[in-house]
């Protein structure tokens, strides 16, 4: 079979060359269209359920929301485990699935179970969007030079204009907004007036809700026309709310404005976002309250295509849609990292091709032969790109970096070198070059085929890997296998045909001094090894033992996920769990100022707490910073373009802020680590038990022990306790004496302390 393929290629040379050119062109187009990821998506399939219940303690959230949700969700097919998190006002539940079904199927099953759960009034569960940890592809802020638009106005523009437009971009699943106060109409009731008029909070709430509706009244006929009837009763202004009638006394209406003041104000915030810019002149422009957003890519979608749509939409927003002076300003654009990664890979590939050509010329000693062999590299690369594109597998730095050019050109080297050897043999001088080349190809066709086939077979176990390791290494295995298949096709079919064209006038024999020198010393080494077999075997065993020692005794480090320099730093500061919003924001401002003071940092953002939609399950005890970095060539000499040195210097500066535990990572890397392990960190130790106090005590003991482990830089404990509560216990006998229900008391306390959202005003 192999012989027939070679014969077919030799007999149809122009057809083979035409097919090769078509494959080259197709491969170039496929390489241009091939989705390229900076980082492989290794996260498991998961579905997130976010339940917000404002004002409710973490303990009550756990008992009345999280546990019922866990109970209902247990038993869903293909669920491997559940992760739950209960915070003040928030329950976050993640269901981790295996790879048996598509995530759309998983979401349908979760939605079916979600309809069966019964939760307390006010608790509103919803499924999180279908995105992956590498799906945060575009971070932006809204910037205004128009004094008419303050941060509250920008928040409204973000929620009602920007978010809607970004969601219209194909494969954009959601936009997560962070920062800026949400506008609301606030009715501040005077308790004394409420008592004097004999009213209750419930009565006021009921009338406010009832007086913000529209209704329909069928239609009437007027002449030849039908006129629809609308009863317009929606609230449009502060005056509409203030004039809402609660009740009447002796024929006189009692309005909201008689017992309360009505105004516009900010909703109670769950987090705050800020940004500082380090200008070229050394000055720092700091804005401690900014409206930001994160554009989320649908899981499995093409990031390049989505980013192109985002860039077009941003241009449209800035030029046509947003008010004058308001602009969308990006501070993280995944396309920058993708372009940097692509440039790095292509640069390395180009250098590799040049080095291979030089080495081939030095050892083969023939320029035409070296060119034939070198053509294997672009052909194999473009062939792999075509196959990956057809199979829908995106390329990434790990898969492209795994291409070994020496392995790719191995078969072509054997084929072409044997052809050159036959062509320079004086016995073949009178024969046709095509006959000599065919004979030479037949001579090595089987060894070349089996050698490359064996290498491809060696990658088969990687295709059986599951879950995280499979998603990490399978794209690499596919890329290498396709490239080797392309190299095999080139070596067996195209290389002999090219030889008939380039060697049709024969091959001049050249006494290669480098090869002569290498062969001479190689023969001496082989003879010496054969004469001393015991020593040769002993050296081999000793080398093997040393390799095992370096590998398994810690001399060579190891990591599960590959490290990619993202050109930025992600800093997390963990505060005391009882910290208040004002103190957390003040500490975040200090940290942002210190980080942005480094000349290597062009800008720095900070976020405290969580977004209003609850998509990041954390509290005010958590502060996170995105630290953008200039190109390493612009860093100060003292850091020697070493990111670890810069991080160490930042850590020393941040230690000036007491009571904060600092950790350093990178934006994508941080998301991936949390997705894989379920915690915000590279490595985590989990302790299981029933007593939270004992668990925290043991956690502190483990931390004290780990501090002595060499190589650990950032270490901390995630506290499950420490949030103080002010408990109101209802005296049921006194409540019964005054004929007051417990629910009325709770509603009054909730409204007085945190307010109660009654209805919605559309403007």
Model-predicted regions and their roles:
Residues 1-36, 442-444, 510-560, 602, ...:
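Signature of alpha-helical transmembrane segments and their immediate interfacial
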Residues 3, 7-13, 299-304, 339-395, ...:
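Interfacial segments of transmembrane alpha-helices in multi-pass membrane proteins
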Residues 17, 24, 29, 33, ...:
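Surface-exposed amphipathic alpha-helical segments in non-transmembrane regions
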Residues 21-56, 115-123, 389-396, 462-472, ...:
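Transmembrane helices with small-residue packing motifs
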Residues 26-32, 48, 354-421, 482:
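Hydrophobic transmembrane alpha-helices and their membrane-interface caps
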Residues 178-183, 188, 289-358, 436-439, ...:
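Juxtamembrane "pre-transmembrane" interface segments
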Residues 331, 338, 342, 416, ...:
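Helix-loop junctions and hydrophobic alpha-helical segments within the transmembrane domains
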Residues 358-363, 380-397, 449-501, 549:
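Hydrophobic, glycine/alanine-rich multi-pass transmembrane helices and their short helix-loop junctions
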């Amino acid at each position: 079979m192999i012989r027939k393929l070679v014969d077919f290629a030799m007999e149809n040379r122009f057809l083979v060359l035409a097919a090769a050119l078509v494959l080259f062109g197709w491969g170039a187009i496929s390489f241009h269209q091939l989705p390229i990821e900076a980082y492989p998506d290794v996260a498991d399939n998961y579905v997130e359920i976010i339940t917000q219940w404002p004002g409710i303690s973490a303990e009550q959230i756990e008992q009345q929301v999280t546990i019922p949700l866990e109970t209902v969700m247990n038993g869903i097919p293909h669920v491997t485990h559940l992760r739950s998190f209960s915070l003040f006002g928030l329950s976050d539940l993640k269901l981790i699935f295996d790879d048996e079904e598509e995530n759309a199927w998983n979401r349908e099953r979760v939605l079916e179970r979600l309809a069966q759960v019964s939760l307390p009034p006010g608790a509103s569960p919803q499924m999180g969007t279908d995105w992956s940890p590498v799906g945060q592809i575009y971070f932006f802020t809204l910037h205004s030079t128009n004094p008419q638009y303050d941060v509250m106005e920008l928040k409204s523009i973000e929620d009602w204009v920007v978010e809607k437009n970004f969601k219209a971009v194909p494969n954009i699943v959601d936009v997560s907004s962070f920062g800026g106060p949400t506008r609301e109409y606030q009715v501040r009731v005077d308790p004394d007036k409420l008592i004097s008029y004999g009213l209750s909070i419930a009565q006021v709430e009921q009338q406010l809700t009832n007086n913000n509706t529209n209704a329909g009244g069928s239609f009437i006929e007027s002449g030849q026309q039908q006129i629809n009837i609308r009863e317009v009763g929606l609230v449009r202004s502060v005056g509409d709310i203030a004039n809402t009638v609660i009740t009447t006394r002796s024929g006189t209406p009692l309005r909201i404005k008689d017992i309360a003041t009505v105004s516009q104000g900010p909703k109670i915030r769950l987090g705050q976002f800020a940004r500082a810019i380090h200008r070229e002149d050394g000055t720092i422009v700091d804005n401690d309250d900014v409206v930001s957003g994160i554009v989320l890519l649908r899981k499995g979608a093409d990031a390049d295509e989505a980013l192109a749509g985002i860039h077009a939409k941003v241009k449209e927003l800035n030029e046509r849609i947003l008010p004058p002076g308001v602009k969308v300003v990006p501070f993280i654009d995944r396309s920058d990292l993708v372009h940097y990664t692509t440039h790095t890979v292509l640069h390395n590939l180009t250098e590799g091709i040049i080095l291979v050509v030089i080495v081939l010329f030095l050892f083969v000693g023939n320029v035409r032969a070296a060119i034939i062999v070198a053509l294997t590299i672009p052909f194999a690369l473009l062939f792999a790109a075509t196959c990956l594109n057809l199979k829908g597998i995106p390329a990434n730095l790990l898969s492209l970096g795994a291409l070994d050019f020496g392995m790719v050109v191995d078969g072509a080297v054997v084929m072409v070198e044997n052809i050159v050897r036959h062509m320079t043999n004086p016995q073949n001088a009178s024969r046709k070059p095509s006959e000599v080349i065919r004979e030479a190809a037949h001579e090595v066709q089987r060894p070349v085929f089996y050698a490359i086939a064996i290498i491809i077979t060696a990658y088969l176990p990687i295709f059986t890997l599951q879950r995280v390791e499979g998603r990490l290494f399978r794209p690499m295995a596919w890329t290498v296998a396709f490239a080797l298949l392309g190299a095999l096709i080139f070596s067996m079919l195209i290389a002999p045909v090219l030889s008939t064209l380039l060697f049709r006038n024969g091959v001049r024999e050249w006494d290669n001094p480098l090869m002569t020198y290498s062969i001479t010393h190689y023969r001496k080494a082989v003879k010496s090894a054969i004469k001393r077999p015991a020593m040769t075997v002993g050296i081999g065993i000793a080398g093997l033992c040393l390799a095992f020692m370096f590998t398994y005794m810690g001399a060579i480090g190891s990591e599960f996920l590959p490290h990619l320099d993202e050109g930025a730093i992600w800093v997390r500061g963990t505060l005391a769990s009882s910290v208040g919003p004002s103190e957390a924001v003040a500490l975040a401002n200090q940290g942002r100022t210190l980080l942005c003071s480094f000349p290597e940092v062009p800008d720095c953002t900070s976020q405290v707490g969580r977004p209003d939609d609850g998509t990041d399950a954390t509290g005010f005890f958590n502060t996170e910073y995105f630290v953008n970095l200039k190109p390493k060539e612009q860093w100060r000499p003292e850091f020697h373009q070493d990111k670890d040195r810069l991080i160490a210097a930042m850590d020393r500066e941040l230690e000036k802020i007491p009571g904060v535990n600092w950790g350093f990572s990178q934006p994508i890397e941080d998301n991936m680590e949390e997705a894989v392990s379920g915690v915000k960190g590279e490595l985590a130790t989990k302790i299981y038990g029933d007593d939270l106090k004992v668990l925290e005590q043991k956690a502190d003991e483990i931390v004290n022990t780990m501090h002595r482990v060499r190589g650990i830089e950032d270490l901390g404990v995630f506290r499950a306790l420490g949030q103080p509560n002010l408990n109101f216990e209802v005296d049921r006998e006194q409540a019964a004496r005054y004929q007051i229900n417990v629910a009325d008391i709770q509603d009054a306390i909730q409204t007085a302390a945190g307010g109660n959202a009654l209805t919605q005003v559309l403007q």
